[in-house]
């Protein structure tokens, strides 16, 4: 029996901070992280190189901080530090699962994690290590979605996988409209004209210009990540 070959050799997985909360209202739910890491371990065993960009919304959201009187740049830097905390938690869970993880930060915090250096990140991926990119782009006013698009382009990822709580992009909010249907695939232009809000505008434009496909899928759905990596009809593909 021939084992199926993954459709992608190198992926960039975008995880929101909120995804780490599980059913909690705040913070990091250990059981949720362990389950996510098991899904990631499953695809690394297939020989897929995995890089992760993690958000920080479960701890602090820069946008929210800025909206209540805090200086926006300061709030964004706090958000970046929140992503470092999440990245450390994720890497710790990976190490306990038998994966080798390396956290690389876009801001200097050398006693805790190593700085992001592109050739080093590529070397880690080639060695089969999981690279977790922390601190977004290192700049205020840029989201972690934009960091995912940027790092995806930099490392030559074949696809950006945006992990959400919904299994793809729908014609309407499936939680509110039972008749909403899932798009199997969309072009970048179609997604823009329908104003579907898949990524923020900067991230979306970067992916479109670099012809870097995006696949939106549910991280809550067991086995969905593996199905995506194997090229099965899972989630929604946005392509050039």
From Swiss-Prot:
EC number: 2.7.4.22
Location of this chain's protein in the cell: Cytoplasm
GO molecular function: ATP binding; UMP kinase activity
Superkingdom to which the source organism belongs: Bacteria
Pfam families: AA_kinase (PF00696)
Binding site for ATP: 14-17, 57, 61, 164, 170, 173
Coiled coil stretches, renumbered: none
Any Gene Ontology CC annotation: cytosol
Activity regulation comment: Inhibited by UTP.
Pathway(s) this gene product operates in, as recorded in its UniProt entry: Pyrimidine metabolism; CTP biosynthesis via de novo pathway; UDP from UMP (UMPK route): step 1/1
Recorded catalytic activity of this chain's protein: UMP + ATP = UDP + ADP
BP-aspect Gene Ontology terms: 'de novo' CTP biosynthetic process; UDP biosynthetic process
Binding positions (UMP): 56, 76, 137-144
Keywords from the named record: ATP-binding, Cytoplasm, Kinase, Nucleotide-binding, Pyrimidine biosynthesis, Transferase
Gene3D superfamilies on file: Acetylglutamate kinase-like
Family: Belongs to the UMP kinase family.
Subunit structure: Homohexamer.
Function, as annotated: Catalyzes the reversible phosphorylation of UMP to UDP.
Entry protein name: Uridylate kinase
Species name: Acidovorax sp. (strain JS42)
Lineage: Bacteria, Pseudomonadati, Pseudomonadota, Betaproteobacteria, Burkholderiales
Gene that specifies this protein: pyrH
């Amino acid at each position: 029996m021939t084992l199926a070959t993954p459709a992608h050799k190198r992926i960039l997985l975008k995880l929101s901070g909120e995804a780490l909360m599980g059913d909690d209202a705040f913070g990091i739910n250990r059981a949720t992280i362990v389950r996510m890491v098991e899904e990631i371990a499953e695809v690394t065993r297939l020989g897929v190189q995995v890089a992760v960009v993690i958000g920080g919304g479960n701890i602090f959201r820069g946008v929210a901080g800025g909206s209540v009187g805090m200086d926006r740049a300061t709030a964004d830097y706090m958000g970046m530090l929140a992503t470092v905390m999440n990245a450390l938690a994720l890497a710790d869970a990976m190490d306990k699962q038998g994966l080798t993880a390396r956290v690389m930060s876009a801001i200097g915090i050398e006693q805790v994690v190593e700085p992001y250096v592109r050739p080093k990140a590529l070397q880690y991926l080639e060695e089969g290590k999981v690279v977790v990119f922390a601190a977004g782009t290192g700049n205020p006013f840029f989201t972690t979605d934009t960091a995912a698009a940027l790092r995806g382009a930099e490392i030559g990822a074949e696809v950006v996988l945006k992990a959400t709580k919904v299994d793809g992009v729908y014609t309407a909010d499936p939680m509110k409209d039972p008749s909403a249907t899932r798009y199997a695939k969309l072009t970048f232009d179609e997604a823009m004209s329908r104003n579907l809000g898949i990524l923020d505008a900067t991230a979306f434009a970067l992916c479109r210009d670099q012809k870097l496909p995006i696949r939106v899928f549910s991280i809550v759905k067991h086995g969905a990540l593996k199905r995506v990596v194997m090229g099965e009809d899972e989630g929604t593909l946005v392509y050039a």
